[in-house]
Amino acid sequence: MKQITAIVKPFKLEEVREALAECGVTGLTVTEVKGFGRQKGHTELYRGAEYVVDFLPKVKVEVVVKSADVDHCVDAIVRAARTGKIGDGKIFVTAVERVVRIRTGELDDTAI
């Protein structure tokens, strides 16, 4: 099993969710986050004063899938989240050793 963590632009969340649903993903976790990479930040004007905003709003989407489904899901996220502009985000894939569904006690693949 693998966990896919995608950091994407907030307005792309619905497209990413739909793309993952088409891959058979039935559940995901979404967290509002802030960060920066090569995009750095931007300046904003507030009450006549200009200031630098270092951290940009993003959303973190986390799903756990069977190892065989990783490439398909990652490709779907890339297609859904890509704008072609700087700041589109990143995807991280990590190994998951164990999953337990608390309600039923199901383990691993059956708990996903």
Regions found by a protein language model. Name each.
Residues 1-112:
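Positively charged, small/polar-rich N-terminal and surface patches that mediate targeting and assembly
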